[in-house]
Amino acid sequence: MNRLELFNILQPIVKSVTGVSTVILANQVQSDGTGIPSPSGEYITIEPKQSVAQRGQANIHRNTSATPLSLDVDVRAQIIVEVDINVYRGVDAISRVSRLQECNKRPDVSSALRTNKLGWQRVSTPNNLTRMQSGNPEQRAQCYVYLYYETTDAVTINSIESASYGIEYEDGTVVATGSVPD
């Protein structure tokens, strides 16, 4: 799942839960490489892939291939993605971002996550980043949302239909030979 796909899934969820209508993808640039100006008023940015980690070991599925003498192997890795969410301006940024905690229990949110094959792990403790800007306090808050999803990497390999073997002592004396299937 790429950055834009994750953003398109999360944007309506964040809009609905926080009540902020302007939710944009973080770190956008124009075609000339310059950053886009920030929106006026209260807005939220989402960086869908702040970091990507794995959970445990990948699940490996093996099936007989439609190709003769082959085996289909599908490696399915469980991915944990850290999503950075920032609320800017408005009246109470910390309250807006704290609404994301446990929002996965809402039926509309859990349905959207399930439809898109995403799991909701948790939300970090919201950070109050309000600072004085040009003599005026500018509201800002941040949290991280941790999501699960599964990737798949399928490959077709040749199957081993038979194998020969030989067992020898270190001096070269043959103890046994054979083949499987025999």
Identify what each model region corresponds to.
Residues I13-V17, C103-S110:
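Conserved short hydrophobic interaction patches
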Residues M1-L69, S164-D182:
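Small/polar-rich, solvent-exposed N-terminal microdomains that initiate assembly or binding
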Residues S98-N104, I160-E161:
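Short amphipathic alpha-helices in soluble, non-transmembrane regions
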